Amino acid sequence: VRPHRTYFGEKDAQQLRVVRRMAEEQRLPVEIVGLPTLREPDGLAMSSRNAYLTLEERRAALVLPRALELARTIVECEGVRDADRLKEALADCIRREPRARIDYVAVTDYETLEELATINRPALLLLAVRIGSTRLIDNTTLAPNRSP
């Protein structure tokens, strides 16, 4: 079978970029299509891992979509461009949730995934957070050209 298109969720943004890059480098005749992250009504990204969360952990997991919204506000409304300043603000937000342990908070170039010091072009905010023993990932696009 030789597919013309393959679909990947944007929830795992790193995987999507790596697969796209591999397809380009190998000159594979396939279109890699990214699909938006599906979310629960309360904003938590849908994931098979959510089934491992207790009720209390499920509530605690809402710190991820809250952190994403905070990031968009800081960059797009307040005009902050310093990636370290943004990451520290998000780490503070996440640490307020006692059940959350940060694996990483990263700000990268939207396409290359290169870490950014300054958010001066389209970027990805990538989060990996453990809630109890369950590792959850999420991300959002940051658009620094949206003026406050």
Question: Across the structure, where does each feature detected by a protein language model lie?
Answer:
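Glycine-rich, Lys/Arg-enriched anion-binding loops that position phosphate/diphosphate groups
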Residues: R5, D12-D103, T108
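Divalent-metal (Mg2+/Mn2+/Ca2+)-assisted nucleotide/phosphate chemistry catalytic cores
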Residues: V1-Y7
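Active-site flanking residues adjacent to catalytic metal/cofactor-binding acidic residues
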Residues: G9-E10, I137
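Phosphate/ribose-recognition catalytic cores of enzymes acting on nucleotide-derived substrates
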Residues: E88-P148
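Fold-independent oxyanion-binding glycine-rich loops
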Residues: E10-K11, V129
